[in-house]
Amino acid sequence: IGRLKNGEYDAVREDIRAVKQAVGDKVLKVIIETCLLTDDEKRKMCDIVCEAGADYIKTSTGFSTAGANFHDVELMVKGVHGRCKVKAAGGISTVEDMEKFLALGADRLGTSRAVKILNGEQAKGY
């Protein structure tokens, strides 16, 4: 995040490329912590992550100030232009949330509350 905010885009891209080269055919998901970025930075990261060869760009770790939101997922889906996949993670607490993220174009969802959600319980907290 620091290098992105400092405008060191080539360094960020090369770091991701190096990781992708190291993992080879394994799936690489790059977490960008959308809650810490501006919309312009999120768009820039979509370009960088896809150009670097990552398989997924992911909204959050679940350990920062916020998780996935509809605005960010829609922005990311548009930003990747099908070049890589989008994973919405963090803060997903209802079936309706899951359905909306998928309708917006998320390819994968991440939640620690899947059992509660699928059992129809409101999963509380972040």
Locate predicted features.
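Alpha/beta enzyme core
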Residues: I1-V86, T94-G120, K124-Y126
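Short hydrophobic "strand-cap" motifs at the C-terminus of beta-strands
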Residues: A89
